[in-house]
Amino acid sequence: MLSGHGGNVKQICDKYGLNPDEIIDFSASINPLGCPDVVRKAVAEQFNDIQHYPDSQCNDLRKAIAERTSCNESNVIIGNGSNELFYLIPRALQPKKGVLLQPTFAEFSDAFSNSNIDVIEIINDDKDFPLINTNIPRLKSVEECMVFLCNPNNPTGQLTRKEDIIELVKDNPNRMIVIDEAFMDFIEDDEKYSVIKEAPLMDNLIVVRSLTKFYGFPGLRLGYLVSNESTVNKLMRYKEPWTVNTIAQVAGLAAINDKEFAANTRQYVSVEKTFLYDGLTTIKGIHPFQPTVNFILVKIEDRKKTSSAIQDVLMKNNILIRNCSNFKGLDETYFRVAVKTRKQNQKLLDALKSVMDDVTSVEDSQKNIVPEFVAEEIQG
């Protein structure tokens, strides 16, 4: 199986003798502001609750999410991270085929494979990677399938308007459409793009979201889905009990009620993604894609350099980027970087400029820096 995540910092540092406290992790697209103070406070105040079993139905959190998304509690399922839900959906609904528009989040393919469902991959050959593209009509040839889409798409960052998603769902009534909106909270005008409020009203739409990326606590694992009541009931028959622990529920409830933090995050990311993108455009030999969210996909145009080699050289400067060569539809000429703090973003720009300005092939200069097999460890 492929790993669909970056951010394996501790594992890499433990195995190869690097200091995790000195690593700047651009491989995982987590909120640069970190975890909200209200979450830290709530967890500290309610820590003693771990002596009791958690609420297996996550009732308080489901109610809060239902209010936030203008639906009923019966339309919501809470998961131990969005990944639990990605694996649950095909296992419970058992489509005849899975369909993926590549490149996209690697866990989708693994989720289908885990349920022994054959996957049809449609490679997006448009250079700008639009989600709704000329290959979409090919879905008509696949009966009773399930389609996983990511909006904004990971790793390309492409954002698709709500009306285009709704049209796709209505045009494919016999195909379950699953939309991963893990990064939608970072979008300032998300009402133009999100279909989460439409999900309870449609028979073939499921929307999945993560709480850990936006609120900066991926170690806790917390996500949720919204769909119509009939679909939720089918999914719940296959969902394992007790998967969401007490601390995660406390953190999630505190987080989604912190509207000031959410507004500050969107403003901060908006400024910093522009700063990082503008800086990347000045570096020769690379082409950054216009960002919509808190990460940027970069195309390497210098044929002497590869993403694996650049990654290895940057690790010498304690900078970890996401090598995108293991995404279907991408190759060794792509990497992804998260938007972080101004100081960290500037350090990345300086280091990357130095790498790209070096007239020596990076493939040659990487020798004796980091063992070649390290690149495989950090491709998640």
Where do the model's predicted regions map?
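PLP-dependent aminotransferase-like
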Residues: 91-149
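Short loop-beta-helix segment that forms the pyridoxal 5′-phosphate
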Residues: 54, 66-88
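Active-site phosphate-binding strand-loop segment of PLP-dependent enzymes
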Residues: 126-187
